[in-house]
Amino acid sequence: MAVYCYALNSLVIMNSANEMKSGGGPGPSGSETPPPPRRAVLSPGSVFSPGRGASFLFPPAESLSPEEPRSPGGWRSGRRRLNSSSGSGSGSSGSSVSSPSWAGRLRGDRQQVVAAGTLSPPGPEEAKRKLRILQRELQNVQVNQKVGMFEAHIQAQSSAIQAPRSPRLGRARSPSPCPFRSSSQPPGRVLVQGARSEERRTKSWGEQCPETSGTDSGRKGGPSLCSSQVKKGMPPLPGRAAPTGSEAQGPSAFVRMEKGIPASPRCGSPTAMEIDKRGSPTPGTRSCLAPSLGLFGASLTMATEVAARVTSTGPHRPQDLALTEPSGRARELEDLQPPEALVERQGQFLGSETSPAPERGGPRDGEPPGKMGKGYLPCGMPGSGEPEVGKRPEETTVSVQSAESSDSLSWSRLPRALASVGPEEARSGAPVGGGRWQLSDRVEGGSPTLGLLGGSPSAQPGTGNVEAGIPSGRMLEPLPCWDAAKDLKEPQCPPGDRVGVQPGNSRVWQGTMEKAGLAWTRGTGVQSEGTWESQRQDSDALPSPELLPQDPDKPFLRKACSPSNIPAVIITDMGTQEDGALEETQGSPRGNLPLRKLSSSSASSTGFSSSYEDSEEDISSDPERTLDPNSAFLHTLDQQKPRVSKSWRKIKNMVHWSPFVMSFKKKYPWIQLAGHAGSFKAAANGRILKKHCESEQRCLDRLMVDVLRPFVPAYHGDVVKDGERYNQMDDLLADFDSPCVMDCKMGIRTYLEEELTKARKKPSLRKDMYQKMIEVDPEAPTEEEKAQRAVTKPRYMQWRETISSTATLGFRIEGIKKEDGTVNRDFKKTKTREQVTEAFREFTKGNHNILIAYRDRLKAIRTTLEVSPFFKCHEVIGSSLLFIHDKKEQAKVWMIDFGKTTPLPEGQTLQHDVPWQEGNREDGYLSGLNNLVDILTEMSQDAPLA
């Protein structure tokens, strides 16, 4: 095994030497020149042998010849030859680096675990032989990849309609889940990836390393060490400015060979060894290196295409077959579609955001080669993983999964970080989690892996598509530098290329999905261009992922990535509807729990019907049938969840109304005690809507400029709602907590003189009024009325006034609602002063302070009425005094209901305290008020002091 990698390293050195001899000069990427030929390169303390302190001496570069004939052959057969001979290259089965227990699980039938041993380079002849084999395999891979890329181009055109086949992830047995892959990945590519997956076997350094994919190097676009070198345990090739010690080789060295992405590079490019410098952590950072994530050990097949596509983005001249993606194949595809599109399809799997810059071989599309951000790995080592300035973090929606090298982590943390892929990051491959995320290692040593894949994040110079590499680890941290990557010239890719979160066929993935309670949109990931825009616009309303509960069983926040154009928005309903959350996030409409609209009959704090008949109507529905406030609030929130049949605008309206819904339903069941069904509606900001009445509107307009204004509800004009006009006024109950309410109808009559005159002109028999009469007093109807079983309206109105305290005291109690919600309207026969006093005592519970407050308020109203211009020139009929108090001993009285209040002819006035005679229009309002004051005064004097 070590022999293969050693031969490959030697090939890189020799290619660099040949380029120098041929005057290749630095490539467009500004790569430095590799070590000169004939010089032995010492790489002490290589990360491939941590802690051993052994130094490796590389022979002169020209001792090895990279020029070997390439013989065609099946990739699988060549791979088998590589694997079968891996143990004999070094002459000792113990010469390979040991592998973690989970390394190579992707192909369990070909798992290889070899004991750690001292790495000793073989002779040049052996290296040449192995190099020939390697070159043949690379050529085969190149051919397969070209075919896969061509198929990918074809598949991209139809991916908007069909869901692509999933990668071969079924055999993955790693405790960590398989990463996402682009939903538009064509099946052809999957086959190539599946074949290459056999390549992953062991890690390259002491700590546990993931079966790293070429994604890291592919994303970087830079040539990286073949993963076969890693598997063989070969020491890394010292690159230009190759770091010493632990930084000799970073996890980013894992590359194409692991993925089976060898390239047929054209010799002469001095960029071969840049991966060492870019991918390597700075000295002393090895302790901070994150263990490679088993998360992606099961799905490294994806990295191959990522590398292949990313590397094709620049006019570079790759130098080493083993180190660079076959730029020929990628370059052929440049004409077919832009490089970013390629990166988009391949690089879109969860957390796979390494430094996704296109091949560092050269600037892309004319961008300057020096264009790259400098990020810092978690340990403080400078890594070029920072995204370029200008990348939009709002679009970052791919959640980064917290990775862990042990089986214990599993997927318990996934729900809080998981989110669907956003539009831009889907294309560029930038990791995101509803905001800015960076994985930093907080566990045992390892190398900082790029995007959970194992590789030092590095931004490629000359790549306009620089993305932040995110060192993997257990903790998700905000990455402030995410704001820096905005000038990505992302090409418009077919809708199918948008990343759709798709678990694929992996049993492990499906299992972990169930375990974590993940909610997916199991669509093809196809999104139209407009859909992405709408999702971005609606994303402002989404909470950031870090606010989500960490419970894996709870549905997590994410953006829907389904073919539906309805933005998927989840607003947590306080944990009461978790069971249905999965279906809702998948876009399935909810047929249950519709929002119960407020009953208009439970809607007013101010006033009862001024019509005489209405005051006699029984309640058609139980006032207690109104929604429970908590239930109403939860139902309102429940409506905010995504439903195909609901628009975002309606959802926002529900949010706007919900606070009032809760308070409104808590306070208003009592309103029906006077029979006001359909008269009121709720309004926002502490107001209510009462059905429009011209007479009442005129009175309210005048009262707003009268001295009585402090004693009437504030009027705010009329509004139109649901096609009807309403008078908008203050909610008088807004300042009370669990109020007790009483309505007293004022005056010695509750009907207008003109109503009586009109009824007499055309008397009509009313069976309904007869029924009401006999319910109160069966002996009240005359014999004639009993025979007809009907009475006229004038007869009923006059009789009605005689049976209650209206005729005797100038007012009557319409109804009482107590703080416990009980309602009593049985005051039709409350006629005597003693009966009224008893009703008030029950209403106030004899509370002295409340009685005093009511008495004083009534006196203030009486004093104001005596000087009010409005009161003098109006016949006040059917108006009420509304008594309200609560457990805090707040007590107020207001004048309400002016629907029957009629202005007098010019120059006429009323005294309001003289008996009524037909034609004098006296209403007896002050008579009733005086009696109320007297009763409350007596009660306050008799009541014990609190």
From Swiss-Prot:
It is found in: Cytoplasm, Cytoskeleton; Cytoplasm; Endoplasmic reticulum. GO terms for biological process: cell surface receptor signaling pathway; cellular response to calcium ion; common myeloid progenitor cell proliferation; inositol phosphate biosynthetic process; inositol trisphosphate metabolic process; MAPK cascade; myeloid cell homeostasis; negative regulation of myeloid cell differentiation. GO terms for molecular function: ATP binding; calmodulin binding; inositol hexakisphosphate kinase activity; inositol-1,4,5-trisphosphate 3-kinase activity. InterPro entries: IPK (IPR005522), IPK_sf (IPR038286). Residues 396-411, 524-534 have a biased composition (Polar residues). IP3K is activated by calcium and calmodulin. Form B is much more sensitive to calcium/calmodulin than form A. Pfam families: IPK. Changing residue 897 to N: Loss of kinase activity. Substrate binds at residues 745, 766, 793-800, 900. SUPFAM superfamilies: SAICAR synthase-like. Residues 768-776 are annotated as: Calmodulin-binding. The modification Phosphoserine is found at residues 43, 49, 71, 204, 269. GO terms for cellular component: cytoplasm; cytoskeleton; cytosol; endoplasmic reticulum; membrane; nucleus. Catalyzes the phosphorylation of 1D-myo-inositol 1,4,5-trisphosphate (InsP3) into 1D-myo-inositol 1,3,4,5-tetrakisphosphate and participates to the regulation of calcium homeostasis. PANTHER family: INOSITOL POLYPHOSPHATE KINASE (PTHR12400), INOSITOL-TRISPHOSPHATE 3-KINASE B (PTHR12400:SF4). This is Inositol-trisphosphate 3-kinase B. It comes from Homo sapiens (Human). The gene is ITPKB.
